[in-house]
Amino acid sequence: MSIVVSNKQKIHYELAGDKGPWMLLHAPHLIPMSAWKEGGYVKQLEQDFRLVIIEPLGQGLSDAPEDASHYTIKSRIRHILDILREVQADYTFFLGVGLGAQVGFQMSKEFPRRIRSLISVGAQPYQELEEAKYMKEKQEQLRSGNLTAYLQQWHSLDHLSADQEKLILQGNPEAYALGLE
């Protein structure tokens, strides 16, 4: 288990693979880092890359402060830069899904030399009005403490394993809501 302290917050990450360039894997909001292994991504990618699998603030073993200032994209980029410094990676390939892709978009804009290439899934760099409204509704749902109702959206798509759901349900709903801001 690897931890880096970034902006006074503990950020959990794991490493895999021992050859090739660095690739950072950043999952979507609330999806545990174990999803990368369960989905077969780590097994496939570690053949050609040294992987950094980040567990974003508010999730899993990373800290979950109840202060919105810690969950900005700028703060999340700082966490990644601190992890890259810790593993001595000058640059990385970046695979981001959802929230991870949004972080990747902004990081590639602000620190273009740190990202060799960006693979984004489930996100685009421009937030639409309807998307903002949807995110506000999801924040309210999380703040109500009813994580089971919030997770229902993934049940219909068969995106969560029982173990992943259990990990999410053990988390802090307020930190999850802040993570959507």
Describe each region flagged by the PLM.
Residues 2-6:
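Short acidic-hydrophobic surface loop/beta-edge motif
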Residues 8-63:
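Conserved HGGG/HGGXW glycine-rich cap/lid loop of the alpha/beta-hydrolase fold
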Residues 22, 50, 90-93, 114-117:
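Structural signature of beta-strand start/N-cap positions in the alpha/beta core
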Residues 43, 52-93:
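Active-site loop/oxyanion-hole signature of alpha/beta-hydrolase fold enzymes
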Residues 52-54, 97, 121:
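The conserved SAM/SAH-binding core of class I Rossmann-like methyltransferase domains
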Residues 92, 96-101:
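Conserved alpha/beta-hydrolase "nucleophile elbow" surrounding the catalytic nucleophile
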Residues 102-110, 115-145:
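Flexible "cap/lid" loop of the alpha/beta hydrolase fold
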Residues 129-132, 144-181:
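Conserved alpha/beta-hydrolase catalytic His-Asp/Glu region
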